Amino acid sequence: MQQNELKTPYFSINEDKLIENLEKAKQLKDISGVKLVLALKCFSTWGVFDIIKPYLDGTTSSGPFEVKLGYETFGGETHAYSVGYSEDDVRDVADICDKMIFNSQSQLAAYRHIVEGKASIGLRLNPGVSYAGQDLANPARQFSRLGVQADHIKPEIFDGIDGVMFHMNCENKDVDAFIGLLDAISAQFGEYLDKLDWVSMGGGVFFTWPGYDIEKLGLALKAFAEKHGVQMYLEPGERIITKTTDLVVTVVDIVENVKKTAIVDSATEAHRLDTLIYNEPASILEASENGEHEYVIGSCSCLAGDQFCVANFEQPLEIGQRLHILDSAGYTMVKLNWFNGLRMPSVYCERSNGDIQKLNEFDYSDFKRSLSQWSVI
């Protein structure tokens, strides 16, 4: 099977690029002693977990089905966290998770009796500081519901928990900024951390970014762990799968209204939602910054503003031409939806030996079932 034989749209995960990121993760672990758990909210394509497992320590989840998926398909440590648990959620996962992290002191009080003796118990804290490029993704934004604020903490709570989680970064490429956050947490919560077994610093630390000083990060994490006598965790998601995956699409039409728009057989609304939510234009492999031919890369959905990007090309685009939308693994496959009844992208993995293996495909029956399974009588 060759790439040009695959029917678009589809995601193509490259094993070599994935391993390149994982080797950086291993380097960080070796320097720091930190444990890394994959954030399934970002990437849950379990068909490639056998590639990832040797490098990471387990998974972390944001909902009960992610907990079950991590337990069944990844193994290692299974961390369960939710912004808001129901009692059924807690009971469903208490027997299969290694750590259960509550978002509030009230949820901790309500459900800890279900978890005690089964899993290590943690609490999410909100230090009121963060590193996030957009307010939508900022855990320390005004009126944040994420974690317990410092001035709301009941000190006695730390006598009955094993660890805490801070998640305050989003695409933080600045190691010094992260170390500054570590120092702020140590100063603000140090007396509490000294009583605990583990601390998770969450995700969003972009240690796989080109040129990132992994050694400096690792030594800072190691120093923090030694100072407070805790096992440190990070929860990478996009850091593991960044630049590993293309969304491959085909130009199905070209229209002109002042600008030329190449319409492709995919949509941000359905297949690459964060492009739309965060207004972050996609990048196209075939584009050229100095190309003379400019096109809007538009989707085939009915949403007027649904477009991937504006890009320049050396040669005019043609109907039937394929384009590779780069870096399309994070928060894409986990957010796929059936808007407009569009064809759902298949998922493939390009192995190191050149083989292409199918991981998932969808058809009309999947679309129909997602809408109803039974009719009114």
UniProtKB/Swiss-Prot annotation:
Main location group: cytoplasm
Entry GO MF terms: carboxy-lyase activity; diaminopimelate decarboxylase activity
Temperature dependence, free-text field: Optimum temperature is 37 degrees Celsius. 75% and 51% of the maximum activity remains at 30 and 45 degrees Celsius, respectively, but the activity decreases rapidly at temperatures above 55 or below 20 degrees Celsius.
Transmembrane segments: none
Catalytic reactions on record: carboxynorspermidine + H(+) = norspermidine + CO2; carboxyspermidine + H(+) = spermidine + CO2
Presence of keyword Lyase: yes
Gene: nspC
Amino acids binding substrate: E238, D274
Activity regulation, short description: Dithiothreitol greatly stimulates activity, maximum stimulation being at 5-20 mM dithiothreitol concentration. Fe(3+), Fe(2+) and Mn(2+) severely inhibit activity (88%, 82% and 50%, respectively), whereas Zn(2+) has a slightly inhibitory effect (23%) and Mg(2+), Ca(2+), Cu(2+) and Cu(+) have no effect.
Family membership noted in the UniProt record: Belongs to the Orn/Lys/Arg decarboxylase class-II family. NspC subfamily.
EC number in record: 4.1.1.96
A Gene Ontology term for the protein's cellular component: cytoplasm
Biological function: Catalyzes the decarboxylation of carboxynorspermidine and carboxyspermidine. 2,3-diaminopropionic acid, 2,4-diaminobutyric acid, L-ornithine or L-lysine cannot serve as substrates.
Keywords: Cytoplasm, Decarboxylase, Lyase, Polyamine biosynthesis, Pyridoxal phosphate, Spermidine biosynthesis
Subunit structure: Homodimer.
Subcellular location per the Swiss-Prot or TrEMBL entry: Cytoplasm
Keyword Cytoplasm: yes
Any GO BP: spermidine biosynthetic process
Cofactor: pyridoxal 5'-phosphate
The protein, known as: Carboxynorspermidine/carboxyspermidine decarboxylase
Domain of life, per lineage: Bacteria
pH dependency: Optimum pH is 8.25. Stable at pH 7.5 and 4 degrees Celsius in the presence of DTT, EDTA and NaN(3) for at least one month. 57% and 72% of the maximum activity observed at pH 7.5 and 9.0, respectively.
